[in-house]
Amino acid sequence: AQNLIVGADFATRFDNREYANNDFNESQTLFSARFTPRIGVEWMEKNRLIFGVDLLQNFGQHNGAREPFLSDVKPLIYYQFNSKNVQANAGIFDRKELLGDYSRAFFSDSTAFYHNRLSGFLGHYKSTERRNTYVEMAIDWEGMYSEESREMFRIISAGRYTLDKGFYFGYAFSMFHFAGKIGNENVTDNLLVNPYAGWEFNAYFDFDIKAGFLFAPQRGRSVDHNWKKPCGAQIDFVLTKWGVKLENNLYLGENLQPLRNIAVGEDIPITYGQDGLYAGEPFYATTEHI
């Protein structure tokens, strides 16, 4: 039997950023809305083929006489296999399909919202015996070799095992192949590994306390052929009640983005940071060890 699937997602984002004496980011307000209608077909209870459109409007964005109706319009189209324990996606699908707990050293909250589609493959296994216990891997093809775009792809993976009484441990991993484009043939390898452990418990509020290690080996082949190996530790504290969440992230360690302010080429006045090498929060480029 075949079933018709119809649905839609709606999300807004308001992010007011005010900084003083900050070298990493600019003060600004990000205010956007996204509407994503979907339609698809399901057969044999486990197979789905989904088509959708991602409609984004940045509030206050203007482009003169050529102003578009919307800030961005992009497709969603993917096949999904879904069973009791296993899910696999292939095509262009929403980032929300990921299960992994990825530190903002991997993806900033802005990256997660504005680069919300993955183009490639996702597979994960989720336990039905233990809560929040899973393993996943995904490949996101982010750029095609051309004059306008680098050839880029990212392999990500995450896993978590939840023990009794709320204790858990897990990992997150990313390998970003940041290759060249026509006129700028340099290649950069950028890896990030994050093993962690934590404890979830309730004491009137819901608490989640997690500590992890961040290791970021990377090599800019146009800069030199030496691997840079910065590392550090991160402690996350989350308090939740009545649908409201307070979160604090503390990073202690070395600059995880050492190529951020280095030019991508001798005759190219663009830094690796401006060119998109790092998807994580710029604050991880701290040189103050905190």
What kind of feature is each model-predicted range?
Residues 1-71, 75-81:
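Beta-barrel outer-membrane channel/assembly domains of diderm bacteria
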Residues 11, 132-142, 148, 156-163, ...:
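Exposed, low-structure sequence patches enriched in small/polar residues
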Residues 20-25, 63-65, 104-106, 264-272:
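Flexible, solvent-exposed loop segments that connect beta-strands
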Residues 23-27, 39, 63-67, 78, ...:
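Outer-membrane beta-barrel proteins
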Residues 28-38, 48, 70-78, 116-122, ...:
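Transmembrane beta-barrel architecture of outer membranes
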Residues 39-43, 79-83, 125-127, 161-163, ...:
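Residue-level signature of outer-membrane beta-barrel architecture
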Residues 47-52, 84-89, 193-200, 237-239:
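A generic structural signal for ordered secondary structure
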Residues 87-160, 175:
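Surface-exposed coil loops of outer-membrane beta-barrel proteins
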